[in-house]
Amino acid sequence: MGNAMLAEPRTLTKAELAELLFERVGLNKREAKDIVDTFFEEIREALARGDSVKLSGFGNFQVRDKPPRPGRNPKTGETIPIAARRVVTFHASQKLKSTVEQSGNPAEVSDDEAAE
């Protein structure tokens, strides 16, 4: 048949991360869940303080303050103010970018694989 079908990309959840720690590191399930929860809580708290988070080989999370700016209602064309806000940005490391690029597109599955 030859046509590649696009499979739904998987989503890795916090619960699955904890399960992987349980399986690969040998922690018990409660410890694995606590580590995952604590890891993300520390990142969340650092960003809430306005700190950057740098994860070597993965990427950087930063908080940016966006100034107020004029916006436009697309339906009416009316100018509306957009308030100042803080946003989180993520910049992938070169190592992560290379890993993703070299992995190809795992969401593409051949007809033969899809039939299994």
UniProtKB/Swiss-Prot annotation:
GO cellular component terms given for this protein: cytosol
Composition bias, Polar residues: 94-105
GO terms under biological process: DNA recombination; positive regulation of metabolic process; regulation of DNA-templated transcription; regulation of translation
Example GO molecular function: DNA binding
Any coiled-coil regions, as ranges: none
Domain of life of the source: Bacteria
Family: Belongs to the bacterial histone-like protein family.
PANTHER family named among the record's database cross-references: DNA-BINDING PROTEIN HU, INTEGRATION HOST FACTOR SUBUNIT ALPHA
Subunit structure: Heterodimer of an alpha and a beta chain.
Xref: NCBIfam families: himA, PRK00285.1
Name of the featured protein: Integration host factor subunit alpha
Organism expressing this protein natively: Bordetella avium (strain 197N)
Encoding gene, per UniProt annotation: ihfA
